[in-house]
Amino acid sequence: MSNALYQSSISSLPLLGHGKVRDNYAVGEDKLLIVTTDRLSAFDVIMGEPIPDKGRVLNQMANFWFRKLAHIVPNHETGVAAETVVAPAEVEQVKGRAVVVKRLKPILVEAVVRGYLAGSGWKDYQATGKVCGIELPAGLQNAQKLPEPIFTPAAKAEMGEHDENISFGEVEERIGIALARQMRDISIRLYKEAAEFAATRGIIIADTKFEFGLDENGTLTLMDEVLTADSSRFWPADSYQVGTNPPSFDKQFVRDWLEAVRIDGKPWPKTAPAPKLPDDVIEKTAAKYREALTRLTGEELQ
């Protein structure tokens, strides 16, 4: 586990905060250093053990997509190498896992796009026949492809709280009609293009979450992470079957173990502290992340 980074400590830059997975530092007035650690969060609780290489995998995967989708929407990239903004002794902490990005004004709405019925979307549909207030045809099954991808936004929650699904009308009220529609249309376009590409690599992108901010001119800008195994549900196309829970290339291993684990004979209540992850779950999860990178991008971990 020696190559794992649970939390960065960059003392040469002001720390802005630790997120669930990322540590953010200020680089001057207009840029940020984002370090993707090997922390893993499941059910909005941060696990106590790192997943080796996970941060580097996510960073490389996000950078791949930012480049691939740059013609659709501006993104937060600056082209400044992370190694150049930290002290020499700190370079090892940022190598392969950090980016220097534009400092944006974040839009506090998660832009979720679903192409398939899965997870909380499937639960919503079973209960109401809708997902986030969007009427869907009757008789759909778990993991079924939707007639068209749908935009199902969520309100960003405080750390440790669950993000809350909201209707498109609520997004319009929060950020204004024009910006809400632009965000929806761009999100669906990003999803469609990514899903088309992933299909050629034998991967289904069931759903994904985009995050946007506004730059100093008020331009909508893609930020944070994009189409990684943390922000998306990736399914291998060769084992996909409607009506089942397809195995995904993400933290599903950890989630399944957490659902099954018993603490003093009782299920884990999905609140901190998390139970200690066994080594085999950590190793299998690390392997899944690496496999997702190679299958999707054709790149080895750099």
UniProtKB/Swiss-Prot annotation:
List GO BP terms, alphabetically: 'de novo' IMP biosynthetic process
Give any Gene Ontology cellular component: cytoplasm
Keywords from the UniProt entry: ATP-binding, Ligase, Nucleotide-binding, Purine biosynthesis
Keyword presence, Ribonucleoprotein: no
Please list the coiled coil stretches. Answer: none
Q: Which domain of life is it from?
A: Bacteria
Q: Which family does it belong to?
A: Belongs to the SAICAR synthetase family.
SUPFAM superfamilies assigned to the protein according to its UniProt record, in alphabetical order: SAICAR synthase-like
**Gene of this entry:** purC
- Which Pfam families does the record associate with it? SAICAR_synt
Q: In which pathway does it act?
A: Purine metabolism; IMP biosynthesis via de novo pathway; 5-amino-1-(5-phospho-D-ribosyl)imidazole-4-carboxamide from 5-amino-1-(5-phospho-D-ribosyl)imidazole-4-carboxylate: step 1/2
The disulfide bonds in this chain are none
Enzyme kind, highest EC tier: ligase
Catalytic activity field: 5-amino-1-(5-phospho-D-ribosyl)imidazole-4-carboxylate + L-aspartate + ATP = (2S)-2-[5-amino-1-(5-phospho-beta-D-ribosyl)imidazole-4-carboxamido]succinate + ADP + phosphate + 2 H(+)
In the Enzyme Commission scheme, what number(s) does this protein have?
A: 6.3.2.6
From the UniProt record, which GO molecular function terms apply?
ATP binding; phosphoribosylaminoimidazolesuccinocarboxamide synthase activity
Q: What is this protein called?
A: Phosphoribosylaminoimidazole-succinocarboxamide synthase
